[in-house]
């Protein structure tokens, strides 16, 4: 299901993206954290080294959940309803239990996310088309461009 328009059922939305230039290649994550009341909006883009696109996608979700927990505190996190938005259909289907995970490294990320998820009231994963995830994608590309410029 890909429902681009939704009523606010969640306290926070975490838009995530991970990307690599080459697969594997130089990689980065982009994360946008927003509260439903508009009081919180944080943007992050970080270079994460040489890895695969799928690995970067998972690292973005892990980063986003950890960062949100840090921002709002453990007690508030325990009651918070979180929507994680990704343009990776593979990631969304794996996290929602529709696709098996073969790669051992991705299995480790899945387990880390499973353990992080229990720190929140509810975590839901939703796929959106790439054009609806431009902010997180922009953060990925900015981090990759910054790293590339360091090397020149």
Predicted regions: what they are:
Residues 57, 61:
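Short, conserved alpha-helix that lines the donor NDP-sugar binding/gating region
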Residues 1, 8-10, 42-45, 97, ...:
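Intrinsically disordered, low-complexity segments enriched in small/polar residues
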Residues 19-23, 62-151:
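RNase H catalytic domain
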Residues 2-55, 66-68:
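RNase H-like nuclease fold core
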């Amino acid at each position: 299901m890909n429902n681009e328009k939704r009523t606010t059922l969640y306290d926070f939305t975490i838009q995530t993206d991970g990307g690599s230039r080459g697969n594997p290649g130089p990689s980065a994550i982009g994360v946008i954290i927003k509260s439903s009341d508009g009081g919180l909006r944080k943007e992050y883009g970080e270079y994460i080294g040489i890895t695969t696109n799928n690995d970067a996608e998972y690292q973005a979700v892990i980063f986003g959940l950890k960062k949100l927990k840090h921002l709002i505190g453990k007690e508030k996190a325990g009651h918070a309803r979180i929507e994680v938005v990704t343009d990776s259909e593979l990631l969304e289907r794996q996290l929602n239990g529709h696709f098996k995970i073969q790669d051992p490294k991705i299995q480790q990320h899945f387990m880390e996310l499973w353990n992080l998820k229990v720190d929140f009231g509810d975590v839901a994963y939703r796929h959106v088309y790439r054009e609806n995830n431009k902010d997180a994608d922009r953060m990925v590309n900015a981090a990759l461009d910054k790293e590339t410029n360091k090397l020149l």
